[in-house]
Amino acid sequence: MRKKQFTLGFLLFLLLQKIIFAEAYDWEKYNITKEQYLLLNEIVESLESNHLIKKEYIDIKDEVSKLYLERLDPNKTIFLSRELVGFEKEIRKSNEIDHGLQQAFLIFKKYRERYLERYNFQLNFLNEVVKKDLQTNKLLLRDRSNANRLDSIPELKTLWKELIINDLIQLRLSNNSLEESRDKIIKRIDNQLNYFNQTDSEDVFDIYVNSLSSIYGPHTAYMSPKNTEDFDINMRLSLEGIGALLTSDGLYTSISSLIAGGPAEKTGNLKPSSPS
């Protein structure tokens, strides 16, 4: 008996340690790095000095923050109207570039908390939903990009619930049983959560800096190392998919040969050793 108690206690200890480490890791991965502070200042300096459109950070910082918030929560299902007022108030406290980045990260952490709250609320509702819940006749605005933000948490929860009910009804109309519909939506929100949990400091930085750069024009953008790698991979796959074999010298990628009869050879637009 004592051995079983010890084993159970040890397993609970390990589980608690995993939870503590998981929470610490989740918090740590959303911290700003020194390199990001330096990089942002370099980007701002470069934009102010070299861009054809002359704009100073101090003049556009409120616009940058507004765009950042729109990109985080475009459908207005996360933040309340009063929360945006609070965010804007904090942002206006300083014109320092570092302060703007700090506020962006604090806002994202709040976003993450509310995102998890929404996930848990919708999951609990899905586990308890019955057919009677679907017997409703309401007009639901799916695209809320031009709607006003809600004023309270109860209003948000009502919206979260109505969005799930709408999805359930749509699936039921496609001849899915209630159980099948529930399982499909749970799988979808689980996948969304898994994808969301892969975000880190680099992603938050990317959203903020691109909110900044896009103020200078639609063709001004920042590509993080992660996005650059994804772009290179997609470009490589695209070229290989049309029958072009690539080689790299570590700095440049070039076309070494074309597969006979492949789309690239047939069009005649690409030649070996052409820069990719």
What are the roles of these predicted feature ranges?
Residues 1-7:
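Bacterial N-terminal signal peptides that target proteins for export
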Residues 3, 18-20:
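Generic signature of intrinsically disordered, low-complexity, basic-rich segments
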Residues 9-18:
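Bacterial N-terminal signal peptides
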Residues 21-276:
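Flexible, low-complexity junctional segments that flank or bridge functional domains
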